[in-house]
Amino acid sequence: MLLWSAVRGLSPPRIVPSLLVVVALAGLLPGLRSHGLQLSPTDSTTPDSQPSRERSIGDVTTAPPEVTPESRPVNRSVTEHGMKPRKAFPVLGIDYTHVRTPFEISLWILLACLMKIGFHVIPTISSIVPESCLLIVVGLLVGGLIKGVGEKPPFLQSEVFFLFLLPPIILDAGYFLPLRQFTENLGTILIFAVVGTLWNAFFLGGLMYAVCLVGGEQINNIGLLDNLLFGSIISAVDPVAVLAVFEEIHINELLHILVFGESLLNDAVTVVLYHLFEEFANYDHVGIVDIVLGFLSFFVVALGGVFVGVVYGVIAAFTSRFTAHIRVIEPLFVFLYSYMAYLSAELFHLSGIMALIASGVVMRPYVEANISHKSHTTIKYFLKMWSSVSETLIFIFLGVSTVAGSHHWNWTFVISTLLFCLIARVLGVLGLTWFINKFRIVKLTPKDQFIIAYGGLRGAIAFSLGYLLDKKHFPMCDLFLTAIITVIFFTVFVQGMTIRPLVDLLAVKKKQETKRSINEEIHTQFLDHLLTGIEDICGHYGHHHWKDKLNRFNKKYVKKCLIAGERSKEPQLIAFYHKMEMKQAIELVESGGMGKIPSAVSTVSMQNIHPKALPAERILPALSKDKEEEIRKILRNNLQKTRQRLRSYNRHTLVADPYEEAWNQMLLRRQKARQLEQKINNYLTVPAHKLDSPTMSRARIGSDPLAYEPKADLPVITIDPASPQSPESVDLVNEELKGKVLGLSREPRVAEEAAEEDEDGGIVMRPKEPSSPGTDDVFSPAPSDSPSSQRMQRCLSDPGPHPEPGEGEPFIPKGQ
C-alpha cells in the first residue's frame, strides 16, 4: 500500500524514470550471481536421462510408455558405427556466462544514467542534497538489496578505479582548465597542495600515534610508520568530490580554482608519501639516506609526470597537423594520447594525474587550431559524458563497497581521526594564508579562508589507497578503511550539504553567470600589456614579463611546427570571421531567411516563372557562449602588442619611421595623405579630380618626382617646404595677378576675378630665398582679421612634411 500511494503521488513524467530504475535493479540481480543463470530443475538432468516426450498419433495425444533398458529399441546403425544418438536442433539457447561481464557493466552504466535523470526530475531534492550524496545513498540501497538476497555485492577494485574511472575525470578537468586563473594563482595553489598536504599528513599521523599509545589494547600495536601512512592517505583533498560539490554551489572563480587546483596538484605528494611509508614499514631501520632519497623522489614523481604529459601533448598536437583529409579520427587522437600519457606515468610510478593535466593543457590550443569544428564539439561532449558517468559510478560503488567490505570499528580511533582531520585542515589553511597574504595583491579574506578550509573534501582516492593496503604488512587495514569511509561520508554528507547555506549566509561572492563583454576583454588585454611595459621599465621580471616571453616564443617557433599550413601565420581573427559568415549563411538558409531554390529540374524552373519568395524578415542568430568564447580567445591571442606600436608621436610627422612595421607605415601614410588632400581642398580651393588622379601613397618632399603630370587647365602651385610660414617666400610669376592675390584679404571677389581672367596661365608660386626674420616678425599677427585672411594664413603656415636632411635652410638661423 505504501508503494502504491508513493506511485500515485508522482506525476506521469516522474513515473517513467522510477520504473526504469526498478527495471535496471531487477536486471542487476540475476547478473550478480556467482554461478551464472540457474535453470529449472527439469532442465538440470543427467546426460544419460532422456526428457519425457509426447507422441502424437492422429488426433490423439498419448504419453509414451515407460521404457526400460531391456525393452528400449536399439539403433543398430548407431551401435555399429559407434556414433552418439542425434539430438534435436536447439531453437533457443541461454548462455549467460558468455555475455556476463559486458552485460553487467552496461547495467551499471544504465543505472548511473537513470539516477542522474531521476535527480533532476525532482528539483526539490537536488536543490537541498548534493548529487554525490544521493548517489552514495543509492549505492548503499543497491548493496543492501544485493546482500539481502544472499549474494555478495561487488567491490570497487583499486585497479578499476585508477585505470578506468579516474582518468576521464582528470582529463576533462585538465583539457578545459581555466588556464589564466590557474597560472595567476599557481604559487598559492602549490603552497596549499604541497606544504598543506605535508602538514596534514604529519600532524594527523603524529596525533594518531599518540592516540594509539593511550587508546587501549586494540590499537596499541599500531606503530608510527603505520599512522604516518594512514595520515598520508586521509590528508589529500579529492578532486572528484570537490568537482561534484563546488560546481553545484557556483562559487567564485578564485575559490574554485584554489580548492580544485590543490586537489589536482596534491596527487604527487600523496603518491610519494604513500609509497615512501609503505616501503619504510618493511624496513628494520630507516636511515638519513632513505629520508633524503624519499625527499628527492617527490621532485622525480611530480616533474616526471609533467614531462611525460608534455611529451604526449606535443606528439598529439603534431599528429593533428596531418588529419585534414581524415576528420573522423581527430577526436580519437586526443583520447588515446592522453590515456597513453596516464598509463606511461603509472608505468614508472610517476604522477598520472600530473601527466593528464599537462597533456591536456599543452595539446588543446594546437589541436583546436588543426581540427574541424565538428571534431571539437565531439571532444567536448564526449569528455563531459565520460567524466560524468565515471563520477556517478564512483559514488555509487562507494556506497556498494561500504556494504560489501569488511569493517573493524573502534570508537576512539574513528572519532579521533575525524576530529583531527578537521583541526589539521583549519590550522593549515589559517597558517598558510597568513603567509600567502604577505605576497598577494588580492588578499584572501576570512570568508575565503573559511570556504577553503570547509571545502577540503575526501573521496574515492583515499578509499582506493586504503583498499590497496596488504593485510600481511598492515594487520589493521580494516580499521584504517573503516575510518577512511567515516571521514568520506562526513565530508561529503555534512560538509557537502551545509556548504551551500553557509555560502549564502556569509554572502560569499559567487560565479558570474554572464560572460564578460568584448570591451572588458580588450581592456584586460590592454592592462596586461601595460603591466608588462611597467615591469620592463622598473626592471622587475614578474609573471607578466615571463608570460610575454612565452607568447613570443610560442608564436615564433612552436606554432610553426605544431599548426598546419597558413594557420600558424595568418591572424586567427580572419579565419574565425569566415567561419562565422559560413555559420550565419547556413543558419539563414535553415531558418528560411533566403528564398527557396527548386530541388528538382522542372519546366516551371526552366521558364523562369517561379514565384518570388516574400521578403522574409532576417533572423539574426543569437551569439552563443561557445562563439563568444572563441571571439575572446582570438582577441587575447591577436590584439596588437604595446611594444609593436609607434615609439614616438609628433603631430608634424607625415611619413612614418622607415624602421617601423610595414603596416604601421601604410596606415600613417594613408591617414596623412587624406589630411593633406583635405587641407588643399579647403584652403587653396584646388579642384580635386579623384577619378583622374591616382591615390597618393605619401606626401611629396623636396625633389621627389611628381606623382602625376598636372593638366594644362589647372594652376600649378609650388610651395617651399623650407619656410612655408613666410608670405614673402612666395613669388608669383604672373606679375599682373600678384597684386590681386596679395589683396585677397581685402577683396576676395577681386581675387576670384583675377583667377578667372588668367585661367590658361595658372598661378605659379616659386620659393624665394628665406630671409632671417626676427622673433617678432615670426609670431606677429596678420594685419587683417577677416576670415579669408585667416584662412590664407592657416594655409601658408601649414608646416607640411619635414624636409630631408640638407634640403633648405633652417627657419630661424642659429645666430638668433
Swiss-Prot record:
InterPro entries: Cation/H_exchanger_CPA1 (IPR018422), Cation/H_exchanger_TM (IPR006153), NaH_exchanger (IPR004709), NHE-1-like (IPR001970), NHE_CaM-bd (IPR032103). Ubiquitinated, leading to its degradation by the proteasome. Ubiquitination is reduced by CHP1. O-glycosylated. GO terms for biological process: cardiac muscle cell differentiation; cellular response to acidic pH; cellular response to epinephrine stimulus; intracellular sodium ion homeostasis; positive regulation of calcineurin-NFAT signaling cascade; positive regulation of cardiac muscle hypertrophy; positive regulation of the force of heart contraction; positive regulation of transcription by RNA polymerase II. Residues 515-545 are annotated as: Interaction with CHP2. It is a multi-pass membrane protein. Belongs to the monovalent cation:proton antiporter 1 (CPA1) transporter (TC 2.A.36) family. Keywords: Antiport, Calmodulin-binding, Cell membrane, Glycoprotein, Ion transport, Lipoprotein, Membrane, Palmitate, Phosphoprotein, Sodium, Sodium transport, Transmembrane, Transmembrane helix, Transport, Ubl conjugation. Glycans are attached at residue 75. Predicted models used for more than 20 years predicted 10-12 transmembrane segments. More recently, the structure of SLC9A1 has been solved and reveals that SLC9A1 possesses 13 transmembrane regions. NCBIfam families: b_cpa1. Residues 37-50, 783-792 have a biased composition (Polar residues). GO terms for cellular component: apical plasma membrane; basolateral plasma membrane; cation-transporting ATPase complex; cytoplasm; membrane raft; nucleoplasm; plasma membrane. Homodimer; dimerization is crucial for its function. Oligomer. Interacts with CALM in a calcium-dependent manner. Interacts with TESC. Interacts (via the juxtamembrane region of the cytoplasmic C-terminal domain) with CHP1; the interaction occurs at the plasma membrane in a calcium-dependent manner. Interacts with CHP2; the interaction occurs in a calcium-dependent manner. Interacts with EZR; regulates the cytoskeletal interactions of SLC9A1 and promotes stress fiber formation. This is Sodium/hydrogen exchanger 1. The modification Phosphoserine is found at residues 599, 602, 605, 648, 693, 697, 703, 723, 726, 729, 786, 788, 797. Kidney and intestine. It comes from Oryctolagus cuniculus. Residues 684-687, 715-720 are annotated as: Interaction with PPP3CA. The keyword Ion transport applies. It is found in: Cell membrane; Basolateral cell membrane. The gene is SLC9A1. One of its GO terms (molecular function) is calcium-dependent protein binding. Residues 122-130, 177-186, 250-252, 323-328, 372-373, 439-444, 506-816 are cytoplasmic. Residues 540-545 are annotated as: Confers pH-dependent PI(4,5)P2 binding. Activated at acidic pHs. Inhibited by cariporide and eniporide. Phosphatidylinositol 4,5-bisphosphate (PI(4,5)P2) and phosphatidylinositol 3,4,5-trisphosphate (PI(3,4,5)P3) bind and differentially regulate SLC9A1 activity. The modification Phosphothreonine is found at residue 603. Electroneutral Na(+) /H(+) antiporter that extrudes Na(+) in exchange for external protons driven by the inward sodium ion chemical gradient, protecting cells from acidification that occurs from metabolism. Exchanges intracellular H(+) ions for extracellular Na(+) in 1:1 stoichiometry. Plays a key role in maintening intracellular pH neutral and cell volume, and thus is important for cell growth, proliferation, migration and survival. In addition, can transport lithium Li(+) and functions also as a Na(+)/Li(+) antiporter.
